Amino acid sequence: MRFDLEPPSSVAAAHRTGVLLINLGTPDAPTPRAVRRYLAEFLSDPRVVEIPQVVWQVLLRTLILPLRGRASAKKYAAVWMPEGSPLRVYTERQTEGVRHLLASNAYQVTVDYAMRYGSPNIAQALAQFKRAGVERVLLMPMYPQYSASTTATAFDAAFAALARMRNQPEVRTVRQYADHPAYIHALAEQVRQYWAQHGRPDFAAGDKLVLSFHGVPKRTLDLGDPYHDQCQQTGALLMAALGLSTLECRVTFQSRFGKAEWLQPYTAPTLRELGAAGVRRADVFCPGFTADCLETIEEIGMEVRDEFIAGGGQAFHRIPCLNGAHAWIGALGEIVAENLQGWPVKAAQPDMVN
């Protein structure tokens, strides 16, 4: 095996610590070609699609990419921001927020972000850390709930990059923070602030709050993936923080792909059923998405909204994701700081002189 070239030992002697925020990824542009390139990488990950690759690659290349590339590009174009993809824009803002917060608290760390699919990728970010003299790395996935198809594959990519290094850094991983008090507080604050600006649902009159998490195939639950249980845990803690019960709030799962059974109840049919049952207002919040993206802005804000209205609902509210919210940046900083304990990340303080 050929290892990557190492920087000069004088650079490696900097003994710096790096924090790498890792999110899913996004196309570089809202065009069919860019979307197909992104989807090809994403859907070729055996952690994401757990069927024999020989069969799957034929279907992917001949049917799925040609059909979904153009359709998905139109959806991305509908949510694209002037600065670029929403997921990348908000992840960059989160990175800058954490960087500033840690620096203001005397942490001497390098903070950056990477995407599991697309760019900047994890290997590139770790290589940049190495060039900067980083010898300790904290991998911080932006997935509060652990899943093999998100958290584990992010770690896979990081470990694959490390396997090519002759001089490897120390590494720590943040596996999940689905029940972390600071994360739950940030979620509750996001909902409260939205209601303060747009009015609180009239729960006594039957209005509902729906907590929509990204779905995964049900078989992963049967095979031991803890994702479903952690989503339910987050949902229960958020309901408690908001003073709500399952009569006013429910947990659903979105973004089903293919014909296999996924975690239920499904978000879109649930919203249509609520509208048909006479629910006047439905608010939807996506606690598992730490940054707004195609699945929240387009799928929830447009497709699911249409389902609710078609069912007979009157008022639909999509509560924005955590994005760059002050409470969320604080929560990220707190979780990162907890996982940096024991590493020399602050400047040495001189001894007090009596």
Swiss-Prot record:
Keyword DNA-binding: no
Cellular localisation: Cytoplasm
Keywords: Cytoplasm, Heme biosynthesis, Iron, Lyase, Metal-binding, Porphyrin biosynthesis
Domain of life assignment: Bacteria
Pathway where this protein functions: Porphyrin-containing compound metabolism; protoheme biosynthesis; protoheme from protoporphyrin-IX: step 1/1
UniProt-annotated binding residues for Fe cation: H214, E295
GO biological-process terms attached to the record: heme biosynthetic process
Enzyme class: lyase
GO MF term set: ferrochelatase activity; metal ion binding
Pfam families found in the cross-reference section: Ferrochelatase
Predominant cellular place of this UniProt entry's protein: cytoplasm
Catalytically driven reaction(s): heme b + 2 H(+) = protoporphyrin IX + Fe(2+)
Record-listed E.C. numbers: 4.98.1.1
PROSITE patterns for this protein: FERROCHELATASE
GO cellular component: cytoplasm
CDD domains per UniProt: Ferrochelatase_C, Ferrochelatase_N
Matching HAMAP family: Ferrochelatase
Job of this protein: Catalyzes the ferrous insertion into protoporphyrin IX.
PANTHER family assigned: FERROCHELATASE, FERROCHELATASE, MITOCHONDRIAL
Family membership noted in the UniProt record: Belongs to the ferrochelatase family.
Record-given protein name: Ferrochelatase
